[in-house]
Amino acid sequence: MSESGSKSSQPLASKQEKDGTEKRGRGRPRKQPPVSPGTALVGSQKEPSEVPTPKRPRGRPKGSKNKGAAKTRKVTTAPGRKPRGRPKKLEKEEEEGISQESSEEEQ
């Protein structure tokens, strides 16, 4: 029974290839550009009436992930206000943290 099913699909596929218009593509079909009667006559020759503007990229640029900060901004907090966000580590604190880790490993 499965053999008859596969045989019947063969002729259908060949008919679709002959027509050329009936293709079963995946996803959304491409939008066909509107054909105006004036351009249909010229057809083979395109005249660039004006230079098309390139599309602007959206979102984050590709190479920006690994770059460091271009400007380092000094954070100055007003007296009496708490700084927002995670507190920044100072070099002294980093060294203390490293020495604490090594002392824990020794124990």
Curated annotation (Swiss-Prot):
Indicate where the modification N6-acetyllysine is found in the sequence.
Answer: 7, 15
Q: Which residues carry this modification: ADP-ribosylserine?
A: 8-9
Phosphothreonine, modified sites = 39, 53
Biological process annotations from GO: autophagy; B cell differentiation; cell population proliferation; chromatin organization; erythrocyte differentiation; gene expression; glucose homeostasis; heart development
Provide any one GO MF term from the record.
RNA polymerase II core promoter sequence-specific DNA binding
Q: Where is the composition biased (Basic residues)?
A: 55-74
Q: Which UniProt keywords apply?
A: Acetylation, ADP-ribosylation, Chromosome, DNA-binding, Isopeptide bond, Methylation, Nucleus, Phosphoprotein, Repeat, Transcription, Transcription regulation, Ubl conjugation
Bias (Polar residues): 1-13
Q: Where is the composition biased (Acidic residues)?
A: 93-107
Ranges for the region named Disordered are 1-107
- Ranges for region Interaction with HIPK2: 53-77
Please name the InterPro entries in this protein's record: AT_hook_DNA-bd_motif, HMGA, HMGI/Y_DNA-bd_CS
Question: What function does this protein fulfil?
Answer: HMG-I/Y bind preferentially to the minor groove of A+T rich regions in double-stranded DNA. It is suggested that these proteins could function in nucleosome phasing and in the 3'-end processing of mRNA transcripts. They are also involved in the transcription regulation of genes containing, or in close proximity to A+T-rich regions.
**Sequence similarity:** Belongs to the HMGA family.
Put simply, this protein is called High mobility group protein HMG-I/HMG-Y
What gene is behind this protein? Answer: Hmga1
